Structures are given as structure tokens and as C-alpha cells.
From Swiss-Prot:
It comes from Schizosaccharomyces pombe (strain 972 / ATCC 24843). Residues 1-76 form the Ubiquitin-like domain. This is Ubiquitin-ribosomal protein eS31A fusion protein. The keyword Ribonucleoprotein applies. One of its GO terms (cellular component) is cytosolic small ribosomal subunit.
Length: 150
């Protein structure tokens, strides 16, 4: 019987085969006509890839059926090298949660009055305290720095 093999270029090859022929035999006949090695050939019929050991009758390939020939692609994408860093990673600052942190900012005097332990920022207003350094006061919000005189 006669079958057709359509290549990717659109060229159609005619092959004389029997329904008992294996897919290996068909691929070797394509190699004789086109010069493509059988290990690079993939034959597709009715949306299925044809396996080498099976026969044409296994796939219900009859006379004047058309097989599609595509080439097998070898391998995958290029592997990327893993980046090597010259300097070690910087350790992230861990935030320490302090229970009842408000107690650091105020003190209750013996007479019952409340005294502020830290100075509030004159630019930012109430509830923004300045950090105490050994020679200065610093506001972390507006970056105001006040120098202390001893």
C-alpha cells in the first residue's frame, strides 16, 4: 500500500509499505529518500507520536494515509552558572519588641506627677521622642540633631 509523509518544509514523500511494517522500517525508508537519520525522526499520525516497535496496523494506518514528520530536538535550555558572591550576605537587623516600652519614656514621681525622661522633637511635635546619644539628641523622623553642651 501507499502512504504519504509530509515534512516540515511542506514537501510530501510517497512510500510503498505494508500494514505489517514497523515504524522502524518506515523511518529507514524515509532515511533512504531524505537522508534524515531515524533517531532524529518523529512520526505523528492522528495527533499521536508513533513508537518504533509498533506496526502501521497498530495505529490503524491505511492506504493513502498521511503521516507528519518532525525532527527530534535534543536537550533542553542552556544551564546557567550559579552566582558566586565575593562578600558575605549582610545580616538583617532584627527588631526587638519591648513589652511596655512606654515605661522607658515616662517616670511617675513620688508626689504623683508624671515626668518625661526623653525630650520631644520640636519639629515633629508631641509623641515623637528624640534619641539620647552621649553628646547629642537625634530625631529619627525628621533627622534633627541637637548638640548637648556639658
Amino acid at each position: 500500500m501507499q502512504i504519504f509523509v509530509k515534512t516540515l518544509t511542506g514537501k510530501t514523500i510517497t512510500l510503498e509499505v505494508e500494514s505489517s511494517d514497523t515504524i522502524d522500517n518506515v523511518k529507514s525508508k524515509i532515511q533512504d529518500k531524505e537522508g534524515i537519520p531515524p533517531d532524529q525522526q518523529r512520526l505523528i499520525f492522528a495527533g499521536k507520536q508513533l513508537e518504533d516497535g509498533r506496526t502501521l496496523s497498530d495505529y490503524n494506518i491505511q492506504k493513502e494515509s498521511t503521516l507528519h514528520l518532525v525532527l527530534r530536538l535534543r536537550g533542553g535550555g542552556k544551564k546557567r552558572k550559579k552566582k558566586t558572591y565575593t562578600t558575605p550576605k549582610k545580616i538583617k537587623h532584627k527588631h526587638k519588641k519591648v513589652e511596655l516600652a512606654v515605661l522607658k519614656y515616662y517616670k511617675v514621681e513620688d508626689d504623683g506627677s508624671v515626668k518625661r525622661l526623653r525630650r520631644e522633637c520640636p519639629n515633629c511635635g508631641a509623641s515623637t521622642f528624640m534619641a539620647n546619644h552621649k553628646d547629642r539628641l537625634y530625631c529619627g523622623r525628621c533627622h534633627l540633631t541637637l548638640k548637648l553642651e556639658n
